[in-house]
Amino acid sequence: MSLERSPSWEHSHTFGTGEPRIGERRTRWVAALTFAMMVVEITAGIGYGSMALLADGWHMATHVVALGVAAFAYAYARRHASDPKFSFGTGKVGALGGFASAVGLALAAILILGESLVRLGSPRTILFDEAIVVAIVGLVVNLASAILLRVEHHHEVTGDAHRHEDHNLRGAYLHVVADALTSVLAIVALVAGKLLGSTWLDPVMGIVGSLVIARWSYGLLRNTSGVLLDAEVSAERRARLKEAVEIDADTRVVDLHLWRVGPEHLAAVIAVVSSAPREPGHYRALLAQFTDLAHVTVEVHRCA
């Protein structure tokens, strides 16, 4: 028997990251659209004196960076999917991209809140008609971008939607939706300000938008940090795996480690004790019903 190469015992460590994904291409498209609209809104916000419009433009600037990070995460994970220095592949790169997006959302919320408070204390003249037109165009671009990313969001997620979520794509999607929200708030503030002859609604809407964006940021931070810290898999899921192995009457699971290694891919390390232990392959076969278990290591001990 040759030990130089044993393909039947080798494991793939790509975990679904080795091929280009639709989300990668669509994220690049949305990044280009967002960049173009960012330039228009920042320029118009400064020129027309609208804080809501300027806030939306600044918000878009953070999203251009976040979308760029998301696109880079897809490409990096794919290019290094088979790199042996990544012990369990590059599946968590997407979660890391989502975490970076969450941080970007938080920074955007802080910037918008700060500038809105300044504008609330020192109102400025606003060219309402011009600003409204630009805000409407921005909303159309944001909605188109959200549709592009939302289609992929549904396509990639199967089964348990929360557990199989593409956090990188989720982060990009939330950035676009946050842009759409600030565009809507800008339009409401500008139209109301024009009709009422008031400028205070403009920064107030900026404050409202910053609080909503901060809430989204917190949710994404919580979800992605769970993946990065291997704390995402539910107790219920762990119990189901344990029950599947303990179907043998004299077998007990004494140690179980379960964590995510990629979208729709989990890894498990299981230690079992039995008075009549079987080969590790027997226990792996008991777990075959869990199709998202991509890497399983079984440690078998004889009961004393």
Regions found by a protein language model. Give the residues of each.
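Alpha-helical transmembrane segments and adjacent TM-loop junctions that form the membrane-embedded core
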Residues: S2-G16, P20-G23, W58, A66-Y76, ...
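Active-site alpha-helix of zinc metalloproteases
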Residues: T34, M51-A55, R170-G171
